[in-house]
């Protein structure tokens, strides 16, 4: 068996990653592809926690820009992440991967409430755990959720899967042809240069808790496994 570099990981999936090229909603073929990649990693005896975004269904920021109360808009975004989590759980379980969804806002009919010790126990039993509903608080992004949960469960790394870029660039490569891709960065670089990898709250949490971050493309099948094995893909962010 191939030897993974990381034994416990947090996979951060944006909502857009689940929408695929259609850009909105959940594309079944995409979510099935992601589920297969997660199964590949689980078969290496790696403990996997997943944090899902909700931008494919609703963005709190968009709602607040339309004049909606920011907290209300953010709570709607949290509910969107639960929909994504349940869809991903279903795809994983169809492949025979035991999966649990834990939500930061209680909704016991559909998922467990987030309890740190229970989440760790699930991981130790080699179940995939999907964290939904963000942190349960408005004004915090799902990137911050990923950083927070990674610190809480003592994950070795955060794997940030993107569907429109294959790493961190000096500018948006989809707009600026002269954008330069970075192989390695520090969190201070990310914060000071405003590189848009994750928001400053999430970056600070990762930096303070010394959690490395790998940014890579989800569109190429097998990339999650490559990242876990320590292959040189995407961009790695670490340290100060």
From Swiss-Prot:
EC number(s) per entry: 2.7.4.22
Membrane-traversing stretches: none
Compartment(s) of residence: Cytoplasm
Species this chain originates from: Geobacillus thermodenitrificans (strain NG80-2)
SUPFAM superfamilies: Carbamate kinase-like
Main localization of the protein described in the UniProt heading: cytoplasm
Pathway assigned in UniProt: Pyrimidine metabolism; CTP biosynthesis via de novo pathway; UDP from UMP (UMPK route): step 1/1
GO molecular function list: ATP binding; UMP kinase activity
Family, similarity comment: Belongs to the UMP kinase family.
Function, in words: Catalyzes the reversible phosphorylation of UMP to UDP.
Catalytic activity entry: UMP + ATP = UDP + ADP
CDD domains assigned: AAK_UMPK-PyrH-Ec
Protein's name according to its UniProt entry: Uridylate kinase
Top EC class for this record: transferase
UniProt note on regulation of activity: Allosterically activated by GTP. Inhibited by UTP.
